Structure formats: C-alpha cells, structure tokens
Amino acid sequence: MKDLSRKAIALTLAGAMAVLAGGQTMTVLADSQEKTVIEYWHCNAETQGGLTVDELVENFNATNDHIEVVAKYNPDMYKGLMQNLQAEAATGNYPALVQIGWAFLDYFSNNFAYVTPQDAIDVYDTKDASFLQDKFLPNILELAVNSEGEQVGIPYSLSTPVLYINRDILREAGLSEEGPTTWEEVSEFAGVIKEKTGKYGFYMQEPADFWAQQGLVESNGAHMLSTAEDGTVQAAFASEEGIEAMQLVADMIADGSALHVSWEEGFQSFVDGNCAMMYTTIARRAATQESAQFDVATVKSPTWGDKERVIPAGGCFLAITAQEEEQIAAAWEFEKYLYSVESMAAWTIGTGYVPPRNDVAEAENGLKDFLAENEMMNAAIEQMDGVVSWASFPGDAGLQAEQMLLDMRDQIFGGQVTAEEGMKSTQNAINELLAAQ
C-alpha cells in the first residue's frame, strides 16, 4: 500500500506542477532577483501527513521562480502550534501561513493579526475574485467563520474520528469481523478480546486535544458548551450523559481491556497487532495502511444505542499571518496551490483527510480512482452528516480551557478520580475562567 500511495501522490503533484507552470491569474510579486521566503507552520508528524507536507512544499518550490516556502513542524498538535505562535508574535515575528485547529478559531482571531482570504484575493488575485464561492460549499466555509461572522481562513484538513479494527484479532476472539457499532458493544468486544486473546481490546487517541472525547460524550447526548438566552457561553459537558461516556472508557482501562498511553504508543500498539481496536482520526488512514501487517478496516464512529451520531470536525483551516505585502502575496499564491485539485488529492491520499474543496472527489485528476479503490475512506465520508463544530471556547480562554480538559482526561483515564468528580470540578473551573474574561 505504501508504494501505491507514494505513486498516486507523485502523479497528482505532477498535475499541480503543470498548473503552476502554466501560470495562474494572480497579481505577480514585485520584481526581484531574490525569492520571497515564507514560513508555513503545520503540526503534521510523519505518521499524520508530514511526508506529504514535505512533498507538496518541495514540488511548489521546484516550479516557482519567485517564492520559496519553508515548512516548520510544530509538535503537540494545534495547541502546541498556538503556543509557539504566541511566543513568536510577542517578538513581532510571524510565519506567513499557519494551520489553525478548529478549537482555536475564536482564540486565534481574538489574539493574532491575520489577513482574511477574501482580502488577500481582492488585492492579489482579482481575476479569481469568486474563488471561495466557486470552490467550497457554504457549510464548509462556515467552519472557519468566527463568532463575529468573519471568514478567518479556509478549511484545509477535514477529518472525523473512526474506529480502526484488526479483523484477524476479532476472528480469533470469535467476534464479528465487521466490528462494533455502538459504544456499549465496543466495551463488550474489548472484554472478550482481552479474555480470549490476552491482547488489548481498545485504544482511544490521547493527543494534546480533547477532540475524540468530544465525539464520545456528544454522541451520548451531552454538550461541550451551552449558550444562555443572554448569549453567555458556558461549559456543559459534566451532564449525566457526559459522565457516563467518559466512565465507560475509564472502566475499560481499569479492567485492562483498554490502553491508557500516549497517541504514538497507542497507534504503534495497534499497527503492531497488540490492540484490536483504535478510535482515532481518519487522517491516520495512510500511516495505518502502510504499517499494519494484518486485515485492517475502518468502521463508522460508534453511537450510543439508537442515539444519533455526533462527531466534531477535526483538522484545521489555513490562515494568513504574514504582515508585509510581499509575504502576504506569496502566502496566498502558495495557499492557492495547496487548494488545487491535484494538491488536495495528494493531501487526501497521503493522509486520509476528507477534501474540503467541492470538486476533488469526482475529478479525473483528483480522487475519483483512489476513492473507488480505497474502502477505508468510506467510513469517514459516510458519516459526514453527523459532523458538528469542534468546541471553541470564547474569548481568550481557549488554550487554558483546553489544557484543563486534557488534565481532566488524564486523571479520569488514569483512575485518580471518577468521571463525575473530574468532569464536575473541571466544568466549574472552566466556567469560572470564562466568567472572569
């Protein structure tokens, strides 16, 4: 599968280079013998698109005679990138283009200087003034609109959490190779797997964000946030349904049928064949296919009984943080390249992210053939009707509130507190933080 993916990416990037070589209808940068150098900040580790980031940047640089892009990886996901951006901004330095996680939409727009995509288009790409409206569906663009109604950036990486299953282990344990469909069944499967095979039954991703856990609790009817009649936003996850959801995973960890380890360790345990089920982003699809030496598949995110599936949109949008004219122009030219059909296809093939642009899936030079052959993408695509926004705390509380959620998760999964104790105390602390703004 590894060679097939790399070949597919190479073919799609060849198309993207042809587009660039043919020239695009955008205002050229000021005449200069030297290239304009810009930084592109991302948080894609090698196992989650980092190699494809490098390939996209290398191909752009090879075909562009006036811009050089330098990609900079930021560990600890979008929270880590925001912390690094905060440190750079304090010194007056900004990268040109950055990935911003959905959970930090309001925090970013409240605390950092940026150029809206339409403003960049209106100045540097006037011949393609309706690019956003032509290439993206309104509900997709809405994901990158802040609470003030401004289009802060353009959706880039779209993901949903799916359940990866090792069908070989399921068969060995005498379970259905189609996997569980509800969270109650996930718990039952995990227990049987541990008893029959001695292997771990389940792992839920634990990176530096609460994204997967939001899907867990909101699918049970809980809400991360609530809005009062006066518009006040409060944390609301410590409801009976939210507590039940988190306690289910904590109980699996306590009885030894589930893992409580870092994201990389959990991923490695799954692809090594030591854990039967892994709940994580579809963006790990490519890395999983390349590493797993067993019958691997994905199934849709489990529901709670007959309740509707509710899952947060994962991934990020791209925002222009360049401050000078040449940097802004270069950032937009590179960003538009990233949104070409060919580049979008390469991004999906190399990761698993669902393309946000509306004409990529069916395009001959896009994903038409790939999606027809790659069934592991189906689970993510088929559950897009259950997607909601990743909870974004209002005002300046985003980073601190997210860290509180991570500390709460570690305490609950680690057995230091019950779900009820941890969630109620953390909810109160976050609401005190929000009220103090």
Task: Give the location of each predicted region.
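Mature extracytoplasmic/periplasmic domains
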Residues: 34, 44, 59, 113-115, ...
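Extracytoplasmic/periplasmic substrate-binding proteins
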Residues: 43, 57, 212-215, 244-333
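Extracytoplasmic "Venus flytrap"/periplasmic binding protein-like
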Residues: 59, 63-136, 172-174, 276-277, ...
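Hinge/lid segment of periplasmic solute-binding proteins
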Residues: 102-160, 214-216, 297-299, 368-371, ...
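Short, solvent-exposed loop/beta-turn-alpha elements that line the ligand-binding surface or hinge
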Residues: 118-136, 179, 222-244, 290-291, ...
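Extracytoplasmic/periplasmic solute-binding protein
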Residues: 143-156, 161, 184-234, 275
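Glycine-centered hinge/linker elements that transmit conformational signals in sensory
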Residues: 189-192, 230-260
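C-terminal capping/gating helix-and-loop segments adjacent to ligand/active sites or protein-protein/ligand interfaces
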Residues: 312, 375-430
